[in-house]
Amino acid sequence: MHILEQRIRNAHAEGRTALIPFITAGFPSSEGFRTALADLDSHGADTIEIGIPFSDPVADGPVVEEASRRALAAGVTLDGILKELRAHPCLRAATVLMGYLNPILQYGTEAFARDAAAAGVSGCIIPDVPLEESAELRALLKERGIALIPLVAQNTDEARMRAYAAVSEGFVYVVSVMGTTGVRNSLPPQVLDTLRRARAAFPLPLALGFGLHDPAQLAAIPEDARPDAAVFGSSLLRHLDEGKSAASFLELWKK
């Protein structure tokens, strides 16, 4: 069993939803990022999703986009992110990199797979790599024990879900809304259908993201559709930008 799947299964065995916070590398500052990473790791994050800043983040909402802009302006690079992660070899939480293909191509796909593995990365989410174009990169990552995480949404049909299921490991990222990331007051009713269809198509645990900001949103989801993990980013980034700690934010999700 892949480590990302194991972390979520372990949380389920403890009777809880796995927590996957998202933070942009280098945000709100280099030191602030290091502190947030350590706080999330020591306060119960099962997996930490780390955003690779990019100048044209098509799947990201305004909060994540602004965090990326500020990180890029501060000189954050993919090489620097991997070096930073190598400096934290004792993280309890698993780590997943979320980014776009262009920086990875510039880095070199083979070098990226090698160096990401050396940095302890367990998974990658790359929204602009469709299934049909993912085989080579998926194979390079898999050789290093890194899962390429699939994203599914309300417009992903059953045939495509099954095609993803045939090659995927780790977990499935279920997108709660059409469009970009960001805080929403409520989840659309269509997400229940997406979760149920994904549950039927995949043997892997489901992580729900895009728009989550309150544990009450999860509690409102019927048991038969409830995800195994929650991904939250924009609300955490706002919390950090206000000078508050990642630890205090995570405690809100553990209550």
Locations of regions flagged by a protein language model:
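A structural motif
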Residues: 16, 45, 121, 169, ...
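Catalytic cores of alpha/beta
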Residues: 30-42, 156-167, 202, 208, ...
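Glycine-rich phosphate-binding active-site loops on the catalytic face of alpha/beta enzymes
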Residues: 47-56, 119-125, 130-133, 173-183, ...
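Short beta-strand/loop segments at the ligand-binding rim of alpha/beta enzyme cores
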Residues: 14-20, 90-100, 141-151, 199-211
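Active-site-adjacent beta->alpha loops and helix N-cap segments on the catalytic face
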Residues: 1-11, 30, 54-66, 72-86, ...
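Conserved, mostly hydrophobic/aromatic
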Residues: 21, 40, 51, 116, ...
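N-terminal small/glycine-rich loop or linker at the start of catalytic domains
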Residues: 6-28, 61-62, 66-67, 88-98
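Histidine/lysine/aspartate-rich catalytic loop segments that bind and position anionic ligands
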Residues: 146-182
